[in-house]
Amino acid sequence: MRHFVTPLLALGCLIGNAAAAWPNGPFKTSGRWIVNANNEKVKLAGANWPGHGEVMVPEGLQYQSIKGVLSDIKGIGMNAIRLTYATEMVDQIYANGGKDIDIKTAFEEGLGKENGTIVLAKVLKNNPTFTAKTTRLEVYDAIAAECLRQQIYIDLDNHISEGKWCCGGEDGNTWWGDTQFDTAKWVRGGAYMAAHAKKWPAKVTQSLRNEPREPTNNNKLRDASYNWSDLYKYMRQGADAVHQADPNAIIVISGMNYDTYVTPLYSGEKMKPRGEVFNRDDFKGYGKDKLVLEIHTYENKGTSCPSLRYNLYNKGFQAMNESDPNVAEVFPVMLTEFGQAMNGADYETAKTYVSCLSQYLPEMQASWFIWVIVGRYYTRQGIQEFDDSWGMKKADWSGWKNDQYIETYLKPQIKGTLR
């Protein structure tokens, strides 16, 4: 019998194939854009989901399921998360003969046996597919699997070496060679996570290091190494290791001074003190189409939108403008951190910043991640159940802390970015 395919059936097949194709990797860069395997632009509008604290398990699971957290993100239109981890997690795996520790151990070591046991019970209740023997990386895998189901992209970010709150000039994690920032372990950790996460289809990018900064309590290290020449040297080492472990990964490079500017990486200027000039050939086999830059801004007390726009452009977004004569290398540039208090006087003070970013980021068509999708942390800066005033979620993660911000500023920012 001869079969005929109706137009409606054919259309249905096409739609089904398109849906099944998400996220349609591998990804690459093309000029100022990240593109998928069909050369379609991939723009990211998302939130930071921290997993780099003392427990080294992504936050909030004592209050919500993984599905619930990601559904809330997706529910307001976001399509991405910046998922953070600490190098110490990988160090512990190597110290344990290559085996990750289970979340029972992680919570007890991070919170103490009594509180760790209590919090773990809540995590298991909200996430019944887990057991006490589930490992930390299996939690990350579950997040990645749910991201795939909900079509949420992942930027995997090495946030800090030592599992704890970040960041400060005296925390030992500032710069390569600081007391807690072992370069060889950092390279090893990036490669390990790249190899592990290459099985996550939703992973688009991998960030090498969050907020390189001046070691303010280590003058010897600062004077010897805190400069663009060394940042470039170390970023090449980290990028090579990640690329070797996962050749499909787009690699995200950050800048100096808490990653507030990356200008020397795209301007063609000579980096101090040794005079290097950024060269894609220094990233052999991937420099042409696997590199992205990232910047941060926390100028949330400013009263001038033109000033904020000027700083963002000249410290990073300029690299997306191929017609700018001061741009030697065109890159996609992501704003991977920005944020402010979600209510009270500090929120009111940040209104210029908030409204300016809500307009400027869509205008620039820049990918971005707000800081931060939390309510209470497992622990932060020695305080268990720390309630972050900057967190987007209510203390118990039950809803948004400031619906007016979400509706008036964030949703239009999301929609405009992803248009």
Language-model segments: residues:
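N-terminal carbohydrate-binding accessory modules
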Residues: G16-R82, I93-G116
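Aromatic- and acidic-residue-enriched carbohydrate-binding clefts of CAZyme catalytic domains
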Residues: A95-R136, C166-Q180
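Aromatic- and carboxylate-lined catalytic core of secreted/periplasmic carbohydrate-active enzymes
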Residues: N300, W400-R419
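Aromatic-lined carbohydrate-binding surfaces of glycoside hydrolases
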Residues: Y85-Q92, A144, R149, Y153-N173
